[in-house]
């Protein structure tokens, strides 16, 4: 691609920690623009749920639905059970460079923990 990409996996829309993660990111999108990176949020929610959530919370990053869970499984970030829902995405962050190589990968210990966004920004700064 022409840009570095930050891929953020999150378990479910309309949950508190996910909202904090992506709203913080939406507010900080200018920082990622300066680092020449596109930010994409991925969850196993339907695109309709994601759209409703994005509008309600004014989330300005690209959201991608992984309803069939193939991307979540390909990145090996499956969380077995959350709020009665099986096989959601774990909370995770990846930085993928312009050549498609993963330069940073982090899966948080629990869905309540946020990824280390400073580490993500540090990796992006080196990739300029």
Outline where the language-model segments fall.
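Chalcogenol-based redox active-site neighborhoods
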Residues: 1-128
């Amino acid at each position: 691609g022409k840009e570095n990409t930050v891929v953020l996996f999150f378990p479910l829309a309309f949950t508190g920690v996910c909202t904090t993660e992506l709203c913080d990111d939406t507010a900080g999108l200018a920082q990622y623009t300066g680092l020449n990176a596109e930010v994409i949020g991925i969850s196993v929610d339907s695109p309709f749920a994601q759209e409703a959530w994005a509008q309600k919370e004014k989330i300005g990053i690209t959201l991608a639905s992984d309803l069939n869970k193939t991307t979540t499984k390909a990145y090996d970030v499956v969380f077995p059970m959350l709020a009665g829902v099986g096989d959601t995405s774990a909370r995770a962050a990846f930085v993928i460079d312009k050549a498609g190589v993963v330069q940073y990968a982090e899966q948080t210990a629990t869905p309540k923990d946020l990824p280390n966004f400073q580490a993500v920004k540090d990796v992006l700064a080196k990739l300029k």
